[in-house]
């Protein structure tokens, strides 16, 4: 498989045919892209606890608006949901890619998500109540890299963290 970034000092994970909605996975990926891994995991845990809504940028038809504190002010959008199933699976995969990075000798507190993407998987059929039904499937790819300039003890605004993650991504490009 060809990648757009150099794979030195990058831990990656590619999950095939996860039983989650592709649309939900795309919106969650947009929310946590270029963030530190620990912060992304905290945000997803808040989504599971229904404290923080996932902002829906692309697939926002008939999506309700949320209260002022439920969507992070960085995103400047009011549409949001709490996609539990997709959040659980993506959180599980983030834990897995963190273990991959630890095996490569990286510091887990300085990891940034430099690439996360969700694509449609193989949509097969399953039997439900004697009838056949379409099965949801999503491919998920995640890459994390260690940012030497990041100090986990310091408090950064979300915009600055996204900028740091994007700079790290651009430095890894071939």
From Swiss-Prot:
Keywords: Ribonucleoprotein, Ribosomal protein, RNA-binding, rRNA-binding
Gene3D superfamilies noted in UniProt: Ribosomal protein L22/L17
A Pfam family it matches: Ribosomal_L22
Biological process annotations from GO: cytoplasmic translation
GO CC term, one of those recorded: cytosolic large ribosomal subunit
Keyword RNA-binding: yes
GO terms for MF: rRNA binding; structural constituent of ribosome
InterPro entries: Ribosomal_uL22, Ribosomal_uL22_euk/arc, Ribosomal_uL22_sf
Function of the protein: This protein binds specifically to 23S rRNA. It makes multiple contacts with different domains of the 23S rRNA in the assembled 50S subunit and ribosome. The globular domain of the protein is located near the polypeptide exit tunnel on the outside of the subunit, while an extended beta-hairpin is found that lines the wall of the exit tunnel in the center of the 70S ribosome.
Family in the record: Belongs to the universal ribosomal protein uL22 family.
Subunit composition and interactions: Part of the 50S ribosomal subunit.
Protein name per Swiss-Prot or TrEMBL: Large ribosomal subunit protein uL22
Originating species: Nanoarchaeum equitans (strain Kin4-M)
Gene: rpl22
């Amino acid at each position: 498989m060809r990648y757009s970034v150099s794979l030195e000092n990058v831990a990656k994970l590619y999950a095939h045919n996860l039983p989650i909605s592709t649309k939900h996975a795309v919106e969650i990926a947009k929310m946590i892209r270029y963030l530190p891994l620990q912060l992304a995991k905290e945000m997803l845990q808040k989504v599971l606890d229904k404290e923080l809504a996932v902002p829906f940028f692309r697939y926002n038809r008939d999506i309700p608006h949320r209260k002022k504190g439920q969507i992070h002010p960085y995103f400047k959008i009011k549409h949001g949901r709490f996609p539990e199933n997709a959040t659980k699976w993506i959180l599980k995969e983030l834990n897995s890619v963190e273990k991959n990075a630890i095996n490569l000798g990286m510091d887990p507190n300085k990891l940034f998500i430099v690439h996360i993407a969700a694509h449609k998987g193989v949509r097969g059929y399953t039997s439900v109540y004697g009838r056949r039904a379409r099965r949801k499937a999503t491919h998920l790819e995640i890459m994390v890299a260690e940012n030497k300039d990041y100090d986990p003890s310091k408090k950064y605004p979300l915009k600055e963290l996204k900028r740091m993650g994007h700079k790290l991504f651009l430095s890894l490009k071939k």
